[in-house]
Amino acid sequence: MNNDEISQENPPVHMILCADDYGISPAVGDGIRSLIEAGRVTATSCMSASPFWREEAAFLLPLMDLADIGLHITLTDQVPLADWSSHSPSGKLPSQKELWWMAIRGQLPEVLLTEELDRQLDEFIAAF
């Protein structure tokens, strides 16, 4: 079997491999950047609500031509960018289970969710 036959029988597959949670911690950021540099991942999603985001974003800038970079929308378990004090006395976004129950009961605070999403997007854009 020659190369022409192989390529016709098994055309190359374009695959995107995304490393999630960039920015959640410096260690995760180091690992994802290493994978991007090695060509092992082709994309990453960034947690702009993380307290490490701004610093980690600066480290990612030189790699922007090597991978697709997107926003990881964070709605659970992290410190919010919007004021959730009326819905979360702990100072954190609700747990996944709590958010799920809020959705089932029709109790999602839509205005607050919109504000959180807007702030996360603004933080993401501001870093680049």
Q: Can you describe what each PLM-predicted range is?
A:
Residues D20-Y22, M47-A49, H72-T76:
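Active-site beta-loop-alpha junctions enriched in small/polar residues
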